[in-house]
Amino acid sequence: MAKDPGRVLIFDTTLRDGEQSPGASLNLEEKLAIAQQLARLGVDIIEAGFPYASQGDFTAVQRIAEQVGGEEGPIICGLARASKADIKACGEAIAPAPKKRIHTFIATSDIHLEHKLRKTREEVIQIVPEMVHYAKSFSEDVEFSCEDAARSDPDFLYELIELAISAGAGTINIPDTVGYITPSEFGELIQGIDANVPNIDEAILSVHGHNDLGLAVANFLEAIKRGARQLECTINGIGERAGNAALEELVMALHVRRSFYNPFFGRDPESPTPLTAIRTEEITKTSRLVSNLTGMVVQPNKAIVGANAFAHESGIHQDGVLKNRLTYEIVDAKTVGLTDNRISLGKLSGRSAVRARLEELGYDLTRDDLNEAFAKFKDLADRKREITDRDLEAIVSEQVMQPDARFQLQLVQVSCGTTLKPTATVTLADQDGTEQTAVALGTGPVDAVCKALDSLAGESNELIEFSVKSVTEGIDALGEVTIRLRREGKIFSGHSADTDVVVAAAQAYVNALNRLIYFEKKNPIHPQHDLIKANL
């Protein structure tokens, strides 16, 4: 039987697999903010990135290892393909962390071996123990993954897993890389590994899954029943294609249905001991932080963290909830940190009050960043009577958590109406302060603004998404704009908030342009799609 830590270990891969969502690229400061909040949330392992991808990714993992890793904090993990160059970069990046892990992987399905790796099973059998052993020279804690395990020959999996454990892997991860498997099949796969790998008792069994068929969470819960004790998941379920298993859904399923899952851990059904180490009251805060910084909007009907998760429209439901919330709610909103508390910040509030509230929301800003956020706060407070938590979150994500800006928006003016052709005048300043102005016509004010910005940037970009939502209530509410641009197949997002949605749209477009330029310089490689060019 696989090693059992007595509870479920939560392995968060928001900063690695989650960041692979189209348009969700994060800069260094954003990654640090999310990593710090994940530590407060109580995750056991943070997969901080793929260090070999680029110098920027290496630096981000290294900084997280330095600033977030600690004796009492989470294990800091880096991803590495089964190559010495990848593993060496990963080992060096995570070195500052007192608790660290190298997560190395290789594809094991026949379709991946033939068409991606162009290697035989015999070659992979030689590679796996050698690379796990090499990873052990950098970190005592090594995890090995069989990429596309769900479509691999089980007997081949058993052989590779036994070799990896013998070489020193303490965690064996079984990924459903393309979201193909069903819960009963996944349970049988985990059970088969548990029964047919002779040394499986020396390792913890982990699972990783994608949501292409909407089954990721269900698959994981079935895997737990069959012996899996580590779940690799992301905040809000973000990730490539249809995303990953959602951390908040898994944790709350284990929390709410604890009496059902307790016996699978050898516990009494009514044992009150939590099945994870997650501080559930931090879930909503973490969800909003990730949504704000990635620009990935949470769907309103998303379980646990969606805007409608605790809303009731039906009169019958409303009546029942007013009499007793348990009639239609299985989760207390306060359990996940959702409260009706309204902060009383306004134009007379001082810097200390703003800083204190930002810290409560999970933002640990430098002095310069705090000054910038406070200036934006005062500007907004002159236009709004009351500033809410969502306003503060919008200020920080739009004003502070941005990559080094190639362009600064100086001015935006539009003229439009029933008899006027929409016209926009935009002024941008570059890094040395030189200003340029452009005028453009469009089908509407936002289209005109985007065309003017493209002319100043010197390249045309494909606008694939423009969305506006109200951050708070009232006629003076901030309008938050999200814009996604596509250039050469890559997607970059920008978001901004303002009481004037046209100004917000202009700033969001500039933020997306700056992010595009920032990541074009990094030019990171993809851990699964790019072939290994380094020598094994």
Curated annotation (Swiss-Prot):
Sequence ranges assigned to domain Pyruvate carboxyltransferase in this UniProt record: 8-273
Gene Ontology annotations for the cellular component aspect, listed alphabetically: cytoplasm
Keywords in alphabetical order: Amino-acid biosynthesis, Branched-chain amino acid biosynthesis, Cytoplasm, Leucine biosynthesis, Manganese, Metal-binding, Transferase
Enzyme Commission number(s) of this protein: 2.3.3.13
Pfam families assigned to the protein according to its UniProt record, in alphabetical order: HCS_D2, HMGL-like, LeuA_dimer
Pathway connected to this protein: Amino-acid biosynthesis; L-leucine biosynthesis; L-leucine from 3-methyl-2-oxobutanoate: step 1/4
Major subcellular site: cytoplasm
Chemical reaction(s) catalysed: 3-methyl-2-oxobutanoate + acetyl-CoA + H2O = (2S)-2-isopropylmalate + CoA + H(+)
UniProt binding sites for Mn(2+): 17, 208, 210, 244
SMART domains the record matches: LeuA_dimer
Subcellular location: Cytoplasm
Biological processes, Gene Ontology terms: L-leucine biosynthetic process
UniProt-annotated stretches for the region Regulatory domain: 408-536
Disulfide pairings: none
Cofactor(s) listed: Mn(2+)
MF annotations from Gene Ontology: 2-isopropylmalate synthase activity; acetyl-CoA C-acetyltransferase activity; manganese ion binding
Family membership noted in the UniProt record: Belongs to the alpha-IPM synthase/homocitrate synthase family. LeuA type 1 subfamily.
Summary of subunit composition and partner proteins: Homodimer.
Functional summary from the UniProt entry: Catalyzes the condensation of the acetyl group of acetyl-CoA with 3-methyl-2-oxobutanoate (2-ketoisovalerate) to form 3-carboxy-3-hydroxy-4-methylpentanoate (2-isopropylmalate).
Protein name: 2-isopropylmalate synthase
